[in-house]
């Protein structure tokens, strides 16, 4: 039976996408474990080893999709996209996914602490983490005021202070706390009128804020 492991990176940040990976290993790879237990150097080295010795898929759900769907359903979307990419490379019989209460479009089983217990999930966690970190490094050049290369979008004290100083961006998750408390309604309406955020996302954010809709 061919088993695919699935995991994500980035459910907790205030900025950027959630990234998922799906992996079928071609052979056993020494040293694989939950990406959070590895150093940056170890993750990078294992990432290259996994890429060479597995079939893998990567999926994303954007900040906009997270605001529209909520983080749970956006995570499921990213995982389904990763599995769809993997499915184009190899057919698999079962999906093992880290966590609980995740409903995917494939025959699957949730494994609590699967990123430690199941090698395929561990491999997926490493790919997802490394890819998301690289995305944050890319975004750090576009949004240079926010030190994204350091905190990777997570709600650190430094990140919060930089938001307070420079304001929010459309790539922030605008339905997340404490973002909702820091969001300017005038800025939100400006983004909506300028088509920087679409109507569906605008409505979801307004609903979260509990204020009247503008021009909808």
Swiss-Prot record:
A divalent metal cation binds at residues 7-8, 98. GO terms for cellular component: cytoplasm; ribonuclease H2 complex. The keyword Metal-binding applies. Gene3D superfamilies: Ribonuclease H-like superfamily/Ribonuclease H (3.30.420.10). Signal peptide: none annotated. InterPro entries: RNase_HII (IPR022898), RNase_HII/HIII (IPR001352), RNase_HII/HIII_dom (IPR024567), RNaseH-like_sf (IPR012337), RNaseH_sf (IPR036397). This is Ribonuclease HII.
């Amino acid at each position: 039976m061919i088993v695919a492991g699935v995991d994500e990176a980035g459910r907790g940040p205030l900025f950027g996408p959630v990234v998922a990976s799906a992996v079928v290993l071609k052979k056993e790879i020494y040293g694989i474990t939950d990406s959070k237990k590895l150093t940056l150097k170890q993750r990078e080295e294992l990432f290259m080893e996994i890429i060479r010795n597995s079939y893998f898929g990567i999926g994303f759900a954007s900040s906009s999709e997270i605001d529209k769907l909520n983080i749970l359903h956006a995570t499921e979307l990213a995982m389904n996209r990763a599995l769809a990419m993997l499915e184009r490379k190899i057919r698999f019989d079962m999906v093992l996914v880290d966590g609980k209460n995740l409903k995917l479009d494939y025959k699957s089983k949730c494994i609590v602490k699967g990123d430690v217990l199941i090698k395929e999930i561990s491999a997926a966690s490493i790919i997802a983490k490394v890819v998301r970190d690289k995305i944050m490094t890319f975004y750090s050049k576009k949004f240079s005021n926010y030190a994204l290369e350091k905190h990777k979008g997570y709600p650190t004290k430094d990140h919060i202070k930089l938001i307070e100083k420079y304001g929010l961006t459309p790539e922030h998750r605008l339905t997340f706390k404490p973002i909702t408390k820091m969001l300017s309604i005038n800025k939100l309406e400006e983004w909506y009128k300028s088509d920087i955020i679409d109507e569906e996302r605008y409505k979801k954010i307004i609903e979260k804020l509990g204020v009247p809709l503008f021009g909808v």
